[in-house]
């Protein structure tokens, strides 16, 4: 079944102002895709963090481009794309750089308007030089991605059962050792 989403507007909607977001979105059909926050850093990096893995550019524009590329890749891995975004929370370390982010955001979304919330934070957990993090929700067709996208059970660390289609790569070895 195809997804069904509708933008919600107030009865007193003003059409004489530019709105870079939708006031609300109703999802009546489709599969929800929840994305962890992405930054300009590589999605897959060591935990605890290692400084040498974070070669971050200095400007908001450059970091926003890298964050949007990471967002796009994660959406594609889930079987959808940027036009499927319905909500995003954007965390910035300096809200004065929001216009730089908005320009990159508009270039990538090409007129698509998910709901957005922008929050200024003192620091992001990924790295001290990180300027932006985007957390998002998308909706895609119920069957988009095929049976390999079916819900799986996960353990408390977020790993799918070994050998299941949701398990990416070889099973992880426990750091705890034998029990």
Model-predicted segments: where are they?
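N-terminal presequence-like segments and the immediate start of the first folded domain
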Residues: 1-69, 73-87, 92-179
């Amino acid at each position: 079944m195809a997804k069904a989403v509708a933008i919600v507007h107030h009865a007193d909607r003003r059409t004489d102002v530019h709105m870079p977001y939708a006031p609300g979105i109703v999802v009546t059909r489709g599969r929800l895709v929840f994305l962890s926050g992405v930054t300009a850093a590589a999605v897959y990096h060591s935990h605890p963090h290692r400084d040498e893995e974070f070669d971050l550019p200095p400007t908001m524009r450059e970091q926003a481009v890298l964050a949007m590329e990471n967002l796009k890749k994660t959406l594609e891995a889930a079987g959808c794309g940027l036009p499927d975004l319905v909500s995003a929370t954007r965390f910035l370390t300096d809200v004065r750089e929001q216009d730089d982010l908005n320009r990159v955001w508009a270039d990538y979304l090409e007129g698509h308007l998910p709901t957005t919330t922008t929050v200024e934070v003192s620091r992001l957990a990924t790295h001290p030089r990180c300027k932006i993090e985007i957390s998002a929700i998308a909706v895609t067709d119920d069957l988009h991605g095929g049976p390999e996208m079916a819900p799986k059970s996960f353990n408390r660390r977020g790993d799918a059962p070994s050998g299941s289609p949701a398990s990416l790569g070889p099973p992880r070895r426990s750091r705890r050792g034998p029990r």
